Regions:
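Short carbohydrate-recognition loop motifs
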Residues: 411-435, 445, 490, 561
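Short, solvent-exposed beta-strand-to-loop segments that form ligand-recognition rims
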Residues: 535-560
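Ligand-recognition surfaces built from glycine- and aromatic
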Residues: 554-586
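Localized edge beta-strand/strand-to-loop motifs within extracellular or lumenal beta-rich domains
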Residues: 517-531
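Short, aromatic/His-centered strand-loop micro-motif at the edge of beta-sheets
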Residues: 497-520
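Active-site mouth of glycoside hydrolases
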Residues: 72-273, 277-284, 295, 307-312, ...
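Extracellular carbohydrate-recognition regions
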Residues: 391-415, 586
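Secretory/extracellular carbohydrate-interaction modules
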Residues: 429-495
Length: 586
């Protein structure tokens, strides 16, 4: 029975240690290979604690400074503490599935996408699927592509884990020489279960052993690889899948890799680390999963997704990061997370929800995916939240995710003309209300927020920027306003009255603005130049990449001011408000 002993409380993260019959073993290592373990004999729990203190002092002395962030602790440890593991599942934007990824391997695309993942999010790890079809039909090319992929990851300080088998989605019809196209509206419609049903011989599962072992063997002591995952979401009522999970784990462990070998679901006999999935925003269940087996630790290899109408949030990135930070703040164990299902909003079509019918219009905000195919963030607020958590280095001038919004006031905000903020998790405004934050001397910046109209009326809601002299009246301020109703996007100037500047017809977009649906609104103000983006979609439906309005205000432009949110003749909700210097605009 493993016993967990927490490291002394400090302002940096120390890996917890595990005690078993007088030995300390660092977590996230291969417990089946004594030759690769760092084992120190101790005589008691007290001496273990003393050893931990000594090691803390030694590490600090060796480093010459305190470890200031999870990212630094991650880099300093070849078997990192799980709180430094923040990433996403990865298939390049061009690929419909993992078979196409490895067959049509494009290193220049992978390089660009991973560089962006590190730049915008500080990502430290990726979860990457393999397939026996590639191994069986082009073995040398497949293994060479894995090595090249690892080289790219290593250049960007990213450590991937690899998945061998998967019971999800298409069990038939996937062939190396028969490429398939994405189907609009069909979530993961071309994803390849592994193995395909034609290769699932219950009398000969051993034929898959070379696939597992020949991938692991050249990398069994390769610190660029974080873990090996035998089976993603096996059907537990399938005798074949349950048996293959057990066999795959044994095949991997035969090679005594330095990396842990893991497998779904949660804790089981075929995993060295609890392998958890969660797509709900009720974080009490996340807590239970994180603490299922303290001796093993936990990684959420699928950690939530965004809100998709009419359903509630599935654990969007800002919520998950706030949950992690909350656990860390009170000294609780912090698991690793792979956010929002996948890194790229690409041809996997996971921007749509599970089970959406073919032909469904583009969503206003992708359900899954952190980066667009051009390697820019879907949400600057999400990028700020994740990067700040991982690196400890904020870039935002202002950020509010409203995860702890109190009644009836909100620190950093001033309300004008109506009721103040309400429930936690978002900012609700009554009709005829505006709230202002920031500094009147701010000049060039990018402002982004999510906006939801609560009914279809002649009213509108949106963002105010370069705000000066605000008051309680609807138009009482000097500055700019960009707002939307279900038909149009409006940009105008306010000087205690309304001066329209530009409009955009929203009805011509494939994604439609509707009540009770989130919209993603972004404004860049640089000198007199103003640009507005709304509800960017996949490039197949949106060649303008979300840019809806662009103009230069040549008549007495307002060049500085604060920011805020506004509702006019309609109740509206707001979330994930961020302000960044203009140079941070992708």
């Amino acid at each position: 029975m493993w016993t967990s002993i927490a490291a002394p409380m400090m302002s940096w993260v120390m890996p917890e240690v595990l005690v078993n019959r007088g030995c300390i073993i660092r977590p996230f290592e291969n417990r089946g290979d004594r030759g690769n373990r760092e084992i120190i004999s101790v005589t008691s729990v007290d001496s273990c604690s003393v050893y931990t203190l000594v090691m803390v002092a030694a590490l600090l002395a060796a480093a010459g400074r305190r470890v200031a962030s999870a990212e630094e602790a991650y880099r300093a440890n070849p078997r990192p503490p799980t709180d430094g593991l923040v990433g996403a599942n990865y298939t390049p934007a061009y690929a419909v599935n993992q078979v196409q990824f490895w067959h049509d391997f494009r290193p220049e695309v992978v390089e660009r996408e991973l560089a962006a993942a590190k730049k915008y999010f500080g990502i430290t790890t990726l979860r990457v699927y393999l397939h026996n079809v590639n191994f069986d039909e082009e073995r040398e090319k497949f293994l060479a592509n894995i090595e090249q992929f690892l080289q790219i990851c290593d250049r960007h300080g990213i450590r991937p884990g690899f998945v061998f088998f998967d019971d999800c989605h298409r069990h038939e019809g996937i062939y190396l020489d028969e490429p398939t196209e994405p189907v609009k509206g069909y979530h993961n419609g071309r994803w390849a279960a592994c193995p395909q049903d034609r290769d699932r011989d219950p009398n000969d599962p051993e034929k898959l052993k070379p696939y597992v072992q020949e991938v692991i063997r050249p990398h069994r002591d390769d610190r660029r690889v974080l873990w090996w995952e035998v089976f993603n979401e096996p059907h537990l009522k399938s005798a074949y899948s349950v048996r293959l999970r057990k066999l795959g784990y044994a095949w991997a462990k035969e090679l005594k890799p330095v990396q842990p070998v893991i497998s779904c679901w949660d804790d089981n006999e075929a995993t060295d680390v609890v392998d958890a999935h969660n797509y709900r925003a009720a974080f009490d269940r996340w807590d239970r999963q994180a603490e299922l087996n303290p001796a093993k630790g936990c990684v959420f290899t699928e950690a939530g997704a965004r809100w998709y109408a009419p359903r509630p949030s599935n654990g969007e990135p800002c919520e998950v990061i706030r949950w992690l930070a909350g656990r860390k703040a009170v000294g609780k164990y912090v698991p690793g997370v792979y956010l929002c299902w996948e890194l790229m909003v690409g041809n996997s079509n996971c921007r749509w929800y599970w089970g959406t019918p073919e032909g469904t219009p583009e969503p206003t905000v992708p359900w899954c995916g952190l980066l667009w195919p051009d390697a820019t963030p879907v949400s600057l607020a999400e990028a700020e939240a994740v990067r700040r958590y991982v690196t400890g280095q904020p870039r935002a001038m202002f950020f509010d995710d409203f995860q702890d919004a109190p009644r009836p006031s909100r620190p950093g905000w001033t309300a004008y003309g109506g009721a103040g903020p309400g429930d936690s998790g978002y900012l609700p405004l009554g009709a005829g209300t505006k709230m202002v934050a920031g500094h009147p001397k701010w000049t060039d910046y990018v402002l982004e927020a999510r906006v939801m109209l609560k009914s279809e009326t002649r009213g509108n809601a949106g963002l105010v920027f370069r705000v000066n002299d605000p008051g309680p009246g609807h138009d009482e301020m000097r500055g700019y306003y960009v707002g939307l109703d279900t038909r149009k996007l409006y940009l105008g100037k306010m000087q205690n009255n309304w001066q329209p500047l530009a409009e955009f017809d929203l009805t011509k977009l494939d994604c439609r603005v509707r009540p009770d649906v989130w919209n993603l609104l972004r404004v860049a103000a640089e000198g007199p130049r103003i640009r507005v983006w709304l509800n960017r979609m996949h490039p197949s439906a949106d060649p303008d990449r979300g840019l809806r309005i662009e103009l230069t205000d040549e008549r007495e432009p307002i060049l500085s001011g604060a920011v805020g949110v506004r509702s006019h003749l309609v109740e509206a909700w707001f979330d994930n408000v961020v302000v960044l210097p203009a140079e941070e605009l992708p």
